[in-house]
Amino acid sequence: MTSARKNSEISINTEVYGALELIKNKILSNFSALMDDEQIKEVAKKGYFNGEPMPYSFGFAPFGEINQNIASKLHAGQRVNLNMDGKIVGHIDVAKVFKFDESMRAKNIFLANESNSEMSLNLGKYGISGEFELYDESLQISKDALNELIKESGAKKITAVFLTADPFNRAHERLVRMTIDKADLVVVFLIRTREERHIDYEIRKQVLDFFNQNYLPTKKVFVFALKNTTLFSSHANPTLECIAASRLGANKLVIGQNHSGIGMFFDHNEVHTILDIYKNDLNLDVIVLPELVYCNKCKTLVSTKSCPHGQHHQIKYHPDVIKELLFNGIMPPAILVRPEISALILSKLYINRFKDIQKLCDDLFVNSGLLENKTDRDFYEELMKLYQTSSLT
């Protein structure tokens, strides 16, 4: 790495890094390099590249005066480092430096979130094409682990689901279970959220892993973490979801009826979406599920299509409402979030919340008579059990 310091450096942020990570690990295409101006034009014109559907080109024109000053002076054959937060995270072997065509920005992977962002995203005047490397191989390791599981299990019916799981609630549970029933393997892509008030990604990952390990059949669900990019956030780019799912072996993608961006329309009384072209190109079946709610008449979780009782009897799984409870230290009702999951989240949000958790648990809960060390998480789980005791209500 010492010699790498002698190279010129381009500064990037996490979002750019996340897009580069997807490109390098062939999550979006079999093509894994930065495109030149001619390749960018081909993608913009055709929507395909090397026979693959490609809604966005991989044109990289680093923004910022310092970055552009460096980019303008680069030449073919030169290596330039990628610097993120003061650390060299990769490098580009420059094949070509070119002037970036502004008319191509709408179809650029690094600007794909622009219409869904409050801030204007930017590219510079000079673009850089060429092969590149990233030194963190965690995404490749996850991809290899998934491929190994597919090979080991012999899974043929593979279904993908994209979730922010912010937070993971009972509706998510039902969605995953319904998906498992008709698949050999379910790949849950855990994606980032752009919500300002959100549960930390690592906590959400722990929750999904906990649920997978304790409440689902072994090796039926694989959690694939996409933590460095918001390209899939808010489900604003469903075409990318289709491509990523297919690239990682899925032949079915399950999305919600309220999935933003799918653009549902009717033709001859048949439901169509903008994803139809990708269904055919990728041999991917896209399933649109109705919204799941809790009905106080049915006394269970139902879909809005199967419940006859109307909205005035239906409790919806609003993420912001559930988060409001959690962020205020309140356990959501068990019909909204599994108590064990609420306990896990609260124990992470409020570390060492209680002055003497051991005494609190000993005085409040029954025990086996043996000395048992208690944690904040144990407290929340036991407390919910007391709330659910109905003999005196």
Language-model-detected regions and their locations in the chain:
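Non-catalytic terminal extensions that flank enzyme cores
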Residues: 1-236, 242-251, 255-393
